Design a protein with these regions (language model features):
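Solvent-exposed coil/turn segments that connect beta secondary-structure elements
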Residues: 5-7, 14-16, 52-56, 85, ...
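A conserved helix-loop-strand patch within extracytoplasmic ligand-binding domains
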Residues: 24-89, 96-99
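Short amphipathic alpha-helical coupling segments at ligand-binding clamshell hinges
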Residues: 196-208
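Extracellular/periplasmic catalytic domains that process cell-envelope and extracellular macromolecules
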Residues: 2-5, 19-20, 40-44, 73-75, ...
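Pocket-flanking alpha-helical
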Residues: 1-28, 122, 142-148
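Pocket-lining segment of extracytoplasmic ligand-binding domains
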Residues: 64, 68, 76-198
Length: 220
């Protein structure tokens, strides 16, 4: 998306999609809308902007679930937890979502941002502790922390994630307030400025990589 005018994506990997792909954040919220990993094969995934169970996070969620559009002032008042600036789902695409919806403003324009170097698990633990009002994560990160969300803090789920001590479901407490554009999976791309950028070269590269994928070495 950042360089769509300069490069042509000629192949992209696919992944198992989710049961939900709505761009309306309210459609992701509540136990009845719990996301399942049973969607069709897709070439992209999304990043979601989540309001946490903090008092202010609940205010933001209530507005979105009532069909209201959040203002920049609403978002700027919140404390955000974001990933490294190189993270597609944890920084880049949420920043692009802000740019598209709030007159070009970015994460770096927000007043209260907490950078996290230790991954999404830390973001969810901050959310559970109500230390922040908004976190950003791939769709749907709640699947991966559903079990640990309601475990006592001295226990771990079967994957080793530490319990976060909440009493209500993560689907009820972590509400989506923003949905980004799709983020490509791994791609093969060619520069439109290259002297080799021709339909023939594009077709040859596509055939070449598809053939490689069909070999045992390519699947390794």
């Amino acid at each position: 998306a950042l360089y769509s005018d300069d490069v042509d994506v000629i192949l992209t990997a696919t992944r198992n999609g989710l049961s939900n792909d709505s761009t309306n954040p309210a459609d992701w919220n509540g136990e009845a809308n719990a996301t399942k990993k049973d969607g069709p094969q897709v070439t992209y995934y999304r990043s979601l902007i989540y309001a946490t169970p903090s008092a202010y996070g609940q205010e933001l969620a209530a507005k979105v679930n009532a069909g209201e559009k959040l203002t920049w002032e609403d978002l700027d008042k919140a404390t955000w937890a974001v990933q490294k600036t190189s993270s597609s789902a944890g920084y880049i695409y949420p920043s692009m979502w802000l740019m598209a919806n709030y007159d070009g403003k970015k994460i770096s324009d927000l007043s209260n941002v907490m950078p996290i170097d230790s991954g999404y698990g830390t973001a969810f633990s901050y959310a559970a502790a109500e230390s922040v009002d908004i976190i950003v994560c791939y769709a749907d990160g709640r699947n991966d922390y559903e079990a640990s969300w309601t475990l006592p803090t001295d226990q771990q789920d079967e994957t080793g994630k530490q319990g976060m001590g909440r009493s209500d479901s993560i689907w009820n407490e972590m509400n989506v307030i923003g949905v980004t554009e799709g983020i490509y999976n791994d791609t093969v791309a060619i520069s439109k400025e290259s002297q080799y950028y021709t339909p023939e070269i594009v077709a040859a590269l596509q055939e070449c990589f598809i053939n490689i994928i069909g070999t045992d070495e390519g699947k390794a």
